Amino acid sequence: MTELVYEQPLNEKIRSYLRLEYLDKQLQSNLNHDHQHRCFYPLFSLCELSERCDYRNEVLKDIERHLLQLSKWQELDHVDHQQIDLYINALTQAREPLQKPERFGSQLKQDRFISALRQRFGMPGACCNFDLPQLHYWLAKPWEEKQQDYRSWIAHFEPLLTPITLLLQLTRSTAHYDNAVAHAGFYQGDSAQALALVRVKVDASHGCYPTISGHKNRFAIHFVQFEQQRHSDRSIDFLLATCA
């Protein structure tokens, strides 16, 4: 069996970042494989999230905070200065496009093809060729042309998604996995340091999955048996990382 990783955000900011990362991974998958009309679902979800909230200020604050921390680490001995320099350069480059006032994805509102599709995609079964003949035409295009179109649409969100990827990488790198045991399927942890993310790695052969709850200083993990859909009463060995 394989080891599965489960992540639980402990604040709203990381929750938003993880949702954006999830959509970004779907977008990248659609660039490599022809998923037909399904490729539009993550694109339209990203459009909606970007319209609801302008993440720019929050991301810029996070970039500045990490740059300050990385600069302090540069002065220490016994650290990987090359890796720190790579992150500083990447964050500095990712910061520049965020200075522009334009809202992410706003230009797609002017795209008549995208706008027509988006209105229909929220309706069950409304992607038939008699509802959206323009979609039927687009889907029949050669894969290379569709790929080029899709890449141009995604590009409107890269100024947001690129720094999100970097910030989550840095968050995850703050903790390594340690061995842990959930006695009777339950584990509770606490931390004097404010936590942002709990990561659980568990072997699928256990036949269970974790449900994680908590806040920045305390969290609880219940393991649930998948087949019975009830809390496990067995001791479960797993790996745990608590990221700040």
UniProtKB/Swiss-Prot annotation:
SUPFAM superfamilies given in the database record: YacF-like
Keyword terms: Cell cycle, Cell division, Cytoplasm, Septation
Transmembrane parts of this sequence: none
InterPro entries: ZapD (IPR009777), ZapD_C (IPR027462), ZapD_sf (IPR036268)
Entry-linked Pfam families: ZapD
A GO biological process held by the record: FtsZ-dependent cytokinesis
Keyword Cell cycle included in the entry's annotation: yes
GO cellular component, one term: cell division site
Domain of life, per lineage: Bacteria
Subcellular location: Cytoplasm
Purpose of the protein: Cell division factor that enhances FtsZ-ring assembly. Directly interacts with FtsZ and promotes bundling of FtsZ protofilaments, with a reduction in FtsZ GTPase activity.
Family in the record: Belongs to the ZapD family.
NCBIfam families xref list: PRK05287.1-2, PRK05287.1-3
Subunit structure: Interacts with FtsZ.
Protein name: Cell division protein ZapD
Originating species: Shewanella baltica (strain OS185)
Gene: zapD
